[in-house]
């Protein structure tokens, strides 16, 4: 595996779902207090030996980061607003990924160590009877039971040791009378022990033939926080990535590039006191224009920005009153469309940086947008509605209703005739501008559907002789391929073990890449549904994407890494 350290130059992602964290939020909201101020929590050990002060701001920030990293971005946003995360003085770029989990693990180890200490201060000699869960660790009855079990096992060990010593004394003369037989038993005992270890069941692994070798994987290092999104330049092998470290980066993967500079760092700054200072906000969305000369980024600081391909800031677009969740260029390249938590969508003039029109039709945060053509687009929201709007019109030209929970993503098919939507209500719906109700209401996933993608096949594509497909990725750890003409699922792809955040078709539509929080990128044959390539990274995968030639897959991860898989033979 090649690792590029990446020299700095001078210069959407929105994980969904929230139900599972409601009790956690409730607990920490109580801790924070009704006004959201910073409170001190004084703690000490049971023996009163050590004291520490923990501010609720610190606890809130770690919970907020945990929600983001685990994909509960709606919950993270709500919790961040109520706990005033943006007003805290914590520099998020200095906090490592999985910080809350790390602290919890250390606390769990402390409790296990405490259980293992006897009343006389000696340490119990032996492994825990069984592993201690996080819930067990906070329940006094369970801890006391474990301590009693430890003491009982210690007593048994002491009794067994005494009996063994007595038996050893009795058999000593027998051993001396037949030393060769004793040595033989010892040697065989070692052999049997080794055989027993090697005979343990191993976790099932993917067939070695599909594993992508490390020589075909390049890991790009440089980001200092999780990388939410990545996108290939449509013309050249430049890979853009957006991170929680308040930067986007452009990685040059062209084979003829000199190896001196592996990345351009696009620092997202805001103006304070006449100076540019880091925004310390996540870069949540990015998109290249059609000819690959400009990159647009959206940030939690509420600004969209346009950058040149060599990393220079061309313009800053500021009219949203809160984080930007999604951002897209139109095909012509003259307009940029953005969706914000302020419940609005905005069309921007890419040349002047001015807002052409703001659309305030949603009653809750807008989560995703997609252009139907150069003037018309669709938007979806946590308000469960989908609006189709057109530049110059002061009201939606169409509104689709039918989902019973937040609508996470929307995508027009290549012809612009059909609109697909997916939701936390576990359904996938297909809409037409010709009717009010959905054409298909597809129900097969058993958890929230996070994202969807149409294949680049069928009418209005460069692959007109191949049937069009739709892929859906869900928190149920599966990916499904759909025949939309018949309204049926043709393949269920089940190798992932954790929520699937991203899917992407190869340019010819023959392959599908999927990325999951299980750290795996899988490449599937879309006709057979077979797994053809697999790669396990070092962090949960937020985004996967194909380059224009279809021979490389980029993936962004929760540990700050960006991986490029070379699929050429």
From Swiss-Prot:
Location of region: Disordered: 170-195
Originating species: Macaca fascicularis
Gene3D superfamilies linked to this entry: 1.20.960.30, YVTN repeat-like/Quinoprotein amine dehydrogenase
Chain positions found as N6-acetyllysine: 153
Keywords in alphabetical order: Acetylation, Activator, Isopeptide bond, Nucleus, Phosphoprotein, Repeat, Transcription, Transcription regulation, Ubl conjugation, Ubl conjugation pathway, WD repeat
Family membership: Belongs to the WD repeat EBI family.
Annotated crosslink Glycyl lysine isopeptide (Lys-Gly) (interchain with G-Cter in SUMO2) location: 332
Listed GO biological process terms: negative regulation of transcription by RNA polymerase II; positive regulation of canonical Wnt signaling pathway; positive regulation of DNA-templated transcription; positive regulation of transcription by RNA polymerase II; protein stabilization; proteolysis; sensory perception of sound
Chief localization: nucleus
Compartments, record wording: Nucleus
Residues with Phosphoserine modification: 175
Name of the protein: F-box-like/WD repeat-containing protein TBL1X
Gene: TBL1X
GO molecular function, one term: transcription corepressor activity
WD repeats: 222-261, 278-317, 319-358, 361-401, 402-441, 444-492, 495-534, 536-568
InterPro entries: Ebi-like, G-protein_beta_WD-40_rep, LisH, Quinoprotein_ADH-like_sf, WD40/YVTN_repeat-like_dom_sf, WD40_repeat_CS, WD40_repeat_dom_sf, WD40_rpt
Residue intervals of the F-box-like domain: 92-137
Subunit structure: Homotetramer; dimer of dimers. Component of the N-Cor repressor complex, at least composed of NCOR1, NCOR2, HDAC3, TBL1X, TBL1R, CORO2A and GPS2. Interacts with GPS2 (when sumoylated); leading to protect GPS2 against degradation by the proteasome. Component of a E3 ubiquitin ligase complex containing UBE2D1, SIAH1, CACYBP/SIP, SKP1, APC and TBL1X. Probably part of other corepressor complexes, that do not contain NCOR1 and NCOR2. Interacts with histones H2B, H3a and H4. Interacts with MECP2; recruits TBL1X to the heterochromatin foci. Interacts with USP44.
Pfam families found in the cross-reference section: LisH (PF08513), WD40 (PF00400)
GO cellular component: histone deacetylase complex; mitotic spindle; transcription repressor complex
Domain LisH: 55-87
């Amino acid at each position: 595996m090649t690792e590029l350290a990446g020299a700095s130059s001078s210069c959407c992602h929105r994980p969904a779902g929230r139900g599972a964290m409601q009790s956690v939020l409730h607990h920490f909201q109580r801790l924070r207090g009704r006004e959201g101020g910073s409170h001190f929590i004084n703690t000490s050990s049971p023996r009163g030996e050590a004291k520490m002060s923990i501010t609720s701001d610190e606890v809130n920030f770690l919970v907020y980061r945990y929600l983001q990293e685990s994909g509960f971005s709606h919950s993270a946003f709500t919790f961040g607003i109520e706990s005033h995360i943006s007003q805290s003085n914590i520099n998020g770029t200095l906090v490592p990924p999985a910080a809350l989990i790390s602290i919890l693990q250390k606390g769990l180890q402390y409790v296990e160590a405490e259980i293992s200490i006897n009343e006389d201060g000696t340490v119990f000699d032996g492994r825990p009877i069984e592993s201690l869960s996080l819930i067990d660790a906070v329940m006094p009855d369970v801890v006391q039971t474990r301590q009693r079990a430890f003491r009982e096992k210690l007593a048994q060990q002491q009794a067994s040791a005494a009996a063994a010593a007595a038996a050893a004394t009795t058999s000593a003369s027998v051993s001396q009378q037949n030393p060769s037989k004793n040595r033989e038993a010892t040697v065989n005992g070692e052999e049997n022990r080794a055989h027993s270890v090697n005979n343990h069941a191993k976790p099932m692994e993917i067939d070695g033939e599909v594993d992508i070798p490390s020589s075909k994987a390049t890991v790009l290092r440089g980001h200092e926080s999780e990388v939410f999104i990545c996108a290939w330049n449509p013309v050249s092998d430049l890979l853009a990535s957006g991170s929680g470290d308040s930067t986007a980066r452009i990685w040059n993967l062209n084979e003829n590039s000199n190896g001196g500079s592996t990345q351009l760092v696009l620092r997202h700054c805001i103006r304070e006191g006449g100076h540019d200072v880091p925004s310390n906000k996540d870069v949540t969305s990015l998109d290249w224009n059609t000819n690959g000369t400009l990159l647009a980024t959206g940030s939690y600081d509420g600004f969209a920005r346009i950058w040149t391909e060599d990393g220079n800031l061309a313009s800053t677009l500021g009219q949203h009153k809160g984080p930007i969740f999604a951002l897209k260029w139109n095909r012509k390249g003259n307009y940029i469309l953005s969706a914000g938590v302020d419940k609005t969508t905005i069309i921007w003039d890419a040349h002047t940086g001015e807002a052409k029109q703001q659309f305030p039709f949603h009653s809750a945060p807008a989560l995703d947008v997609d252009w139907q053509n150069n003037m018309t687009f669709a938007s979806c929201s946590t308000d469960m509605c989908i609006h189709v709007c057109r530049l110059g019109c002061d009201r939606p030209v169409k509104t689709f209703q039918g989902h019973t929970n937040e609508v996470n993503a929307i995508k027009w098919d290549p012809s612009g005739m059909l609109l697909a939507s997916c939701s936390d209500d576990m359904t996938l719906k297909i809409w037409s501008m010709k009717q009010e109700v959905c054409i298909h209401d597809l129900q097969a996933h058993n958890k929230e559907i996070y994202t969807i993608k149409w294949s680049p096949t069928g009418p209005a594509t460069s692959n007109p002789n191949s049937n069009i497909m739709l892929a859906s990725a869900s928190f149920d750890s599966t990916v499904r391929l759909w025949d939309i003409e018949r309204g049926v699922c043709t393949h269920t792809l089940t190798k992932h073990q954790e929520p699937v955040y991203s899917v992407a078709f190869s340019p010819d539509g023959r392959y599908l890449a999927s990325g999951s929080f299980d750290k795996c990128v899988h490449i599937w044959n879309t006709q057979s549904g077979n797994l053809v390539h697999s790669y396990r990274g070092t962090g949960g995968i937020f985004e996967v994407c194909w380059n224009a030639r279809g021979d490389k897959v980029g993936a962004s991860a929760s540990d700050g890494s960006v991986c490029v898989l070379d699929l050429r033979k």
